[in-house]
Structure formats: C-alpha cells, structure tokens
C-alpha cells in the first residue's frame, strides 16, 4: 500500500512540475520587446523607455538596492548600464563576476523592483572610465589596433562577450528576465568609420544573445550614418538643452516609422582635475525630458546617479590629457552619495505626469551622515618600501613593459658631467618628479602639456631619478592607446650637445592595498602634524556608530587612499575635489584603518578628517589657467585675412571653405558680429580639413589665445570631441572676439567645419567671421 501511495505521490508531483514548467514556458514565450511603427513594443503594446543610467561598479553593492529604488521613485521603468570589461578581466583570462562585479545580481535586483534593463557590453564604453573600459593589458601587444579588426583584439573581445552573455543572456526578456535591449559597441562615429568592425561586434552579440533580443547602436546626430547597420535600432545621444527636433531630423528622414530614443540624455557633466566643478541647469534638463516624453520619445538619463570611480578607475579626456576626478557626481538628479537633488524633485514632478499611477515613495538614505575629529596618521613608510619588480634596460620601460597596470614607476640612471644649464626633455605619462642625487629639482605634468624642465649643471656620477605616477588612461577618442610611464627616450641638452641615457633601472610601485600593507610592515612613527615626505601614511579612528562620510584630504598632496582595505580613489590637492566619498557600509564600529599613499608628500601634515558633507568645488591652483595673454594675440597689421564670410543662422554643422588651400600652424578666427546681435559668442566644435577635404587630427591641438572665456567654457572645449560642450565668452566681453588655435605643426588647410551650440536657436552663434591661417614655417 505504501509503495502504491509512493508512486501515486511521485506521479502527482511529476504532473504538477510539468504543469508548472509549461506555465513558465508559456509565460516566457509571451514576453517580448520589439520594434513597432513609431514605437517600441513590450509584449506587443506600445512602450516608452524611461531609463536611468547607473553603473554598478560605481556603487557599493550594499547600496545597489537603494539606488535602484531611488530610480524607481523618480518614475523610471528601466535601468541602463555598461558592462566594464576591464573590471571583470583585470588580468588576461582571469574573469571576476563576484561581489561588486556581480552584474547579474544587479540586473536581478532591478527585476525585483519591476524595472527593465538595457545592457551596453561594449567592448568599449567610454564613461569617463579607465581606458574606456578596455583592459590595460591589451597594450602589452605594442602593435595592437584597438576598436578595429585586429586579430588579437577581436579574439579577446569575443571571449569577453561570451563570458558576459553567460552571465546575462539567461536574464533576457525572452527567458522571463528584465533585459530588453543590448547595445552594439558605443558611439563609434566619434572614433572612426568602420562598418565591418561594427558588424563583427554585432555578429558576436547576435551569436551570444540569439535573435530574440533587440540590438541597437548609439551615436550622435552628426555622425550616426557613418556606421549605421541596417538591421539595428538607431538611437541618438545628446545633452541638456539640445534642440530635440533637430537631433532626430536626419533619423526621421531615413527611417520615418522608426521609434525615437535618446540613449544618452546628459543630465550634467564630469569634472576634471584642475578645472571648476561642472553643473547644468535643472530647468533645462527637466524641460528637455518633458518635451521628449510629450512627443513619445524614449530616453535614458545619463547619468541619473553617477556614483564614484573608486580606486584607479577614473579615466581621462583628450585632446591633450585631462584626467577625471574620483567623484562621478555628474551633477545628476541623484548625487554621488545617493541623495535626491533639486533636479530629482523637479524631474519627479514631470515624470509623475507620464506615470500610470502614483510614483513610489522616495526611500530613505541607507545610513546617516557622520563626522569625526581630525585624525593624525602617525605611521610612515618611504615609497621604497613598496617597490616591486626591477629591470635594467637601455631605455625607459613603460608600465605595460613591466606588467603593471596602475601605480608609479621609478627610473634611475647615472649621468656624466653636464656643464651649464641642462634641458631635460621627456614624454612622461602622467606626473613626473625629477631628483638629482635625491634632491627634488622639478616636475612635469602631462595635464599641463609639460614635457621639459631645466636642471642645474650636473657633476659626473650624479644619479638622476624620475618618479612617474600614472593617472587614468584616456577613455575617449583615438588617444585611448595610452601607455603609462616614460614613453620614448629622455634627452638632456646642453650647449655642447644632446645626451641620451642608455642605462636605466626601472622599478614598479603598484598602487594596491596589498603593496601599501607590505610597505607599512616596516614603518616608523612620525609627527603627523609636520610630515611632508612622499610615502605611505597610516592612522586609525574609532566609531561608536557608522554612517556615510567624506574623507577630507586637503592636507595631503597627490595619491590614493584606502579605508579598511577599500580603495576610495585618487586625491590631488589642486582640486576641485578635496573630499573622497566614504560609504558607511565600508566602516565598522570600533577601530577603522586609514592608509594614504602620497607620491608628492603632505602639504599640511599627515592628517585627515571625516566630514558630513562633500567638498568637490574647491580649486588650489598655483596659478589660474588663462589664455588671454596679449603676447599670444594676433600681431596687429601683420597678417592677411584668408577669408571674410557670413555664416548661416541655426543649429547644425557648417563648412567654411577657404578661397584656396593655405599652409600654416595657427588657425585664428575673428568674430565681428553674432546672429542675435549680442556680444557673447560660443562655438561647440571646430575641425580643419586638409587639401583633400579630410579632417585633420586634433590630438595635438592646443589653445594659443582667447580674448575671453566664461568659467569652464574655455577654448579647448571647441576641440574636445564633445558636441555638447562649448567655448563661450563672458557676457560682458565686447566684440570683436579673437581665438587662436595651435594645431601643433605647419600643415595645409582648405576649410574649417564649424558647429554652434546645440540648444534651440544656437545661442551665441557667430555671423560675421574673419579666418586667418599663419605661422609654423
């Protein structure tokens, strides 16, 4: 009898399991995300994507759920996220999808709260992230061609995309998961034109994700057609205040029945070391989202919550070298530490109008904010305690040559007698300090384009030591192939000639916590209040309760911080960021450890303090960077105007074609009149064309002169590869306005390409312009 009952029970359970399986399969089959006429379709019904861009590595895992709930309460129905290759494969072939890298867990949390997910798996992501998400170890292959059909690069991309799909493809909507769209590459039009490469990435993703996922590619309105693939959804990226109709005009011509989506609507902007904190008006952002939704256009708000580029993950911008700060606050609706801003509350009011029901309540912060008294860091160890591998070479070796991704390299060599003044020249990536027999004699800072310094007369046998700290690798444009350390030779020039050292000792100094701990194992006690030497510093503080806080680093110089083993990120006394966000989930009751690696040494003693508020807008520059030196202005009456022209009003690119190609190094524009009759002038982007009508590379362009610059709207914004940023004069500055750009060398120029600001009406756009090409022969 028992046997009969046992079999009946098993049969009943089996039938029940089959019934449940069929139900799940039927439910899964009914879930789809597709493209309809003028709209996206979710399960066959019109669906407007209202996405919040958030990045899981920039948020402590303990706070993921809070940030997701904040996005939900804002009125968003989707999360948009990059998958960062270099955080998952920090060493070739060694993948990590655990802990704060568990992107699948992040997506499951989104689904738990009723949100869909858009996945952007690169391989390149930009995001003001180290090397745009590409792993540094790719550069160990010197001839590699990044973001092209280089065999080795494509093999590694294929492996990465396979591993990502293993984690995330089971979470696609076809399987009942939250993932509705997957992006192919990222803004490739701003990098180049290579449809075969973009097609190859698409094919990889199609192979890994199947044909039931919607693939799309994003670009700018000015370049999306260069790499547009016929079987992909096309989306546009643009920023606060942009003329939305103009941004989608070309797409509407080519695909009148396609759904419209702004895949990156930039809520603010990122900060760079040595420049003012960036902000964008709340009203302009909110009005833009309102207009977008009123027209049934989908969007992803980049960023809704920026978070923090912890550790060494902050990138750098180009042309030139402009390293990003640790904070990725982005002036977003949800600030760096998870609190709603005025942008949040204003946007929430608008989003409520487009919601099906009442929005969820805004969740409380997961922790209170705390502060502490000043903390003295009394333990000290010299930089040499952290030395790693050493190699001898006939040339300076880069980080990549030494198999080091991040940190500092120390180069030493012995000099012969060099009488008189000595000019040392080198291309150091990124911040180099120079010593003669242990005495500091100067520095070069790549962010200031410094490549040389003068040395005193050198005696025979003098030791030359160069300490080079690497900052974030460039994350945007062609300069992403960014080696660290000394790139090329070091030369020393005297009246008697040029000498190039050929006997170098190169020593690594990694910037990880393990190295810091090793260094401090042989520490000494110092007077923290008077400390000034480069090296490692450690101190402790006790807490009776934990909470979020901000570690004030103003007393220190330049380097990295670790609290209880967690890498908070880079600090630099020049600002604008002076505090580092310290999540309360990384603290504990009782004793907490602070370790500081300072490569230049404290400025005001070895001390820190936990504050209950951030300081991210305080500059401490030796001298302000200005470009209105009269010595750099146009020589009066000595130059011939190449062209006087009248520009058209309105948004969009215009070509200014010279009467004949001219050769020169400098491009000067003299603006005599603006379209609106006012004196304030603005330019979003400028390009030059060579004699064949091709765009001239701008990587070496620099500002020579600008008669006026308003705040962060400096002239370099006119050639920073970003169409949403711009040069703008002060409102009180009078016409005519003059700008001069140094292209780096003499070359033939046949035309200029000019882009006014993207906002409706193109505010500050020029009307009457004189063009001059001169110098460099």
Feature map (PLM): residue ranges:
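Catalytic-core region of carbohydrate-active enzymes that cleave or remodel glycosidic bonds
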Residues: 208, 241-335, 339
């Amino acid at each position: 009898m028992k046997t009969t009952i046992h079999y009946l029970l098993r049969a009943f359970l089996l039938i029940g399991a089959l019934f449940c399986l069929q139900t799940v399969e039927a439910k899964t089959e009914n879930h789809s995300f597709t493209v309809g006429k003028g709209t996206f379709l979710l399960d066959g019904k019109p669906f407007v994507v209202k996405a919040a861009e958030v990045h899981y590595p920039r948020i402590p895992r303990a706070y993921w759920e809070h940030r997701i709930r904040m996005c939900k309460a804002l009125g968003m129905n989707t999360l948009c996220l990059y998958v960062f290759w270099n955080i998952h494969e920090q060493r070739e072939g060694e993948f990590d999808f655990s802990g704060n890298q568990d992107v699948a867990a992040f997506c499951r949390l989104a689904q738990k709260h009723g949100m869909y997910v858009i996945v952007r798996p690169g391989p390149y992501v930009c995001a003001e992230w180290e090397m745009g998400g590409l792993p540094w170890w790719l550069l160990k292959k010197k001839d590699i061609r990044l973001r092209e059909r280089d065999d080795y690069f494509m093999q590694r991309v294929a492996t990465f995309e396979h591993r990502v799909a293993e984690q995330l493809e089971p979470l696609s909507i076809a399987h009942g998961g939250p993932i509705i769209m997957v992006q192919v590459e990222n803004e490739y039009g701003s990098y180049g034109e290579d449809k075969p490469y973009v097609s190859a990435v698409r094919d990889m993703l199609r192979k890994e994700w199947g044909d039931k996922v919607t693939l799309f590619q994003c670009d700018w309105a000015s370049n999306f057609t260069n790499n547009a693939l016929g079987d992909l959804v096309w989306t546009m990226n643009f920023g606060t205040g942009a003329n939305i109709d103009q941004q989608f005009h070309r797409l509407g011509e080519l695909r009148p029945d396609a759904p419209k989506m702004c895949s990156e609507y930039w809520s603010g902007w990122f900060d760079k070391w040595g420049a003012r904190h960036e902000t964008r008006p709340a009203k302009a952002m909110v009005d833009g989202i309102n207009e977008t939704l009123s027209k049934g256009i989908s969007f992803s708000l980049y960023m809704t919550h920026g978070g923090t580029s912890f550790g060494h993950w902050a990138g750098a911008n180009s042309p030139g070298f402009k390293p990003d700060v640790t904070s990725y606050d982005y002036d977003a609706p949800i600030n760096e530490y998870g609190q709603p801003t005025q942008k949040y509350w204003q946007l929430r009011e608008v989003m409520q109008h487009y919601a099906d029901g009442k929005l969820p309540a805004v969740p409380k912060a997961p922790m209170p904010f705390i502060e502490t008294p000043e903390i003295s860091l009394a333990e000290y160890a010299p930089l040499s305690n952290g030395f790693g591998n050493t190699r001898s070479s006939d040339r300076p070796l880069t980080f990549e040559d030494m198999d080091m991704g991040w940190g500092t390299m120390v180069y030493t060599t012995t000099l012969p007698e060099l009488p008189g003044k000595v000019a040392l020249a080198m291309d150091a990536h990124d911040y180099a300090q120079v010593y003669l027999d242990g005495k500091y004699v100067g520095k070069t800072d790549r962010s200031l384009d410094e490549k040389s310094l003068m040395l005193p007369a050198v005696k025979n046998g003098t030791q030359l030591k160069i300490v080079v700290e690497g900052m974030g690798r460039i994350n945007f444009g062609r300069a992403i192939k960014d080696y660290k350390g000394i790139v090329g030779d070091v030369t020393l020039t005297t009246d008697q000639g040029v000498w190039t050292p050929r006997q170098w000792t190169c020593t690594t100094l990694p910037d990880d916590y393990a190295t810091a701990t090793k260094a401090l194992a042989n520490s000494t006690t110092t007077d923290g209040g008077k400390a000034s030497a480069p090296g490692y510093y450690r101190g402790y503080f006790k807490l009776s309760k934990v909470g979020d806080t901000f570690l004030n680093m103003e007393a220190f110089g330049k380097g990295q911080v670790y609290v209880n083993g967690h890498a908070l990120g880079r600090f630099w006394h020049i600002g604008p960021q002076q505090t580092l966000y310290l999540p309360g989930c990384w603290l504990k009751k009782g004793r907490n450890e602070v370790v500081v690696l300072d490569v230049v040494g404290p400025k005001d003693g070895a001390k820190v303090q936990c504050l209950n508020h951030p300081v991210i807008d305080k500059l401490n520059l030796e001298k302000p960077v200005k470009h209105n030196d009269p010595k750099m202005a146009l020589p009066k009456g000595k130059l011939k105007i190449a062209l006087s022209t009248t520009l058209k009003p309105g948004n969009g690119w215009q070509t200014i074609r010279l009467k004949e190609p001219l050769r020169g190094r400098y491009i000067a524009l003299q603006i005599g009149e603006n379209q609106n009759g006012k004196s304030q002038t603005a330019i979003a982007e400028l390009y030059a064309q060579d004699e064949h009508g091709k765009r001239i590379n701008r990587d070496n362009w620099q500002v020579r002169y600008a008669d006026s610059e308003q705040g962060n709207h400096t002239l370099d914004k006119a050639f920073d590869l970003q169409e949403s940023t711009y040069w703008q004069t002060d409102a009180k500055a009078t016409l005519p306005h003059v700008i001069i750009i140094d292209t780096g060398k003499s070359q033939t120029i046949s035309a200029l390409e000019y882009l006014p600001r993207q906002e409706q009406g193109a505010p500050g756009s020029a009307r009457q312009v004189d063009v001059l090409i001169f110098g460099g022969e």
